[in-house]
Every structure is written in structure tokens, then in C-alpha cells.
Amino acid sequence: ILKSLRTSLLLMVMVLSCSCSNEENSAPHKGATLPIMQGIADNVPYIQSVEKEAAYDLHEGIHITDVTFTYCAHPTRMLIAEIDLTKNVTIAVSTPDNKPEVGILKQQVKVQAEKAEASGRKVLLGTNGDYYSQSKTDDTWIPGGLVYKDGVALWTKLGWEADHAFYLLDDGTAHITPVEEFNAVKDHVRDALSGWQRLLIDGQLAGKFTVNDNAMQFHPRTFVGV
């Protein structure tokens, strides 16, 4: 059973700074050959060309796509994990030392994976989850929003813009909703983390996001979808 560290289906890594080119790539789908990447390349104008693609099954129910492309004139790598929750895998929230608490210790995802496996869980894939910040009054680490683990609410204070939640219910189904809808079913939530802006709602763009290649810095980001 997969016990994923901080839930994610999509990991996008970008280099700092961005200077986009207006040059058009004449290759079909900007060079993408995999269907999932063709759809992304066709709908993201800031992707200029796709250089390398690889796809493989990490485990039954977990399909990985590893892509290198040019985004705003800079090399970018993106990892996509498609997880089939109808197979013998699931997604779970992790915490430092695999304990039912947050805010006490800052710990790398790799170490959290080792701690989870030491407790009997088989970890196949892990990534970072929500934001956190250091308390201004004591040496603790404050989650950016909701944290539920194994049916227990570990953190319920909502941080700045943490107005959505990704969560799994007791029946194993995954959902992304505004916090108000989450609150209506929170008694049946198994694992949950908060999130910021939604890119898509029911397959439609949720809003307009501006990329200013002269002023913005780009950082590694994690996205999740259902």
C-alpha cells in the first residue's frame, strides 16, 4: 500500500528567473509525443519546446511521466504521477517521525518516508505538501493550513489564502473542494492538506494567472488534481 508523503499527483520543477521567447515551435505539440504532455504543451503558451519524455509504471496503479522542456527560455523538468486509487495503492499525509503531531519538528520528505516505512508502511512515492512557516514567538513550525492524518485533525487553523483542501474520505475517494465544502464532510475525512489557488474546476480554467517574465522568480511547485 502506498503511503505517500504529503499528497501530490504532479511535481513541477522550474529554475529561477524567466525570460520568455516569442519564437514559435513548428513541431507538432512543440515536440511532445506522449498524449498527456501533448495536451499540456498545446495549452501552456510559455512552454516553447519539449526535449525529452519518459513514461513508466512505478507500481501497479502508479504511472510516471518524466518530462524535460523549455519554459520561458529555461530548462524545466516536470514529474507527473498518475495514481489509480482503485488499485492496491492509496495516498496519505505524512508527518515528521510519522507521529500524530505537527509544528514540533521540521523534517525532510526522505526522512519522513524512512520513518513511515519503519512503522510498517510501504512508501512508493513522496513529495512535499502544503506550505509552512516558522513561528515568530517560539521555535515551532506552523502549517499553511489544514492537516488531517489517519482521521485525526492535527491542525485546523487556516493560513493566508489556504482556502481549498485536498482530502481522502474514509471510503478512499479523493476530493478537492473549498474549505466550506470540506467542513461539511470533515467527520469522514481520513487525510487532508490545504492548498492555495485552484487552476481548474470541473475541467475549466478557474482564473487568469499572469506570468511576468521580467519580474517574477520561479520556484519548485507541487500540484495535485483529481
Where are these regions (language model features)?
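Glycine-rich, charged/polar anion/phosphate-binding loops
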Residues: T65-V67, A162, V185, G207-V211, ...
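Bacterial N-terminal signal peptides that target proteins for export
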Residues: I1-L9
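A short secondary-structure junction signal
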Residues: T137-D139, I176-E181, K186-V189, T210-N212
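Extended C-terminal subregions enriched in glycine
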Residues: L168, A174, L205, F209-V226
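C-terminal motif of bacterial Sec signal peptides marking the signal peptidase cleavage site
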Residues: L16-S19
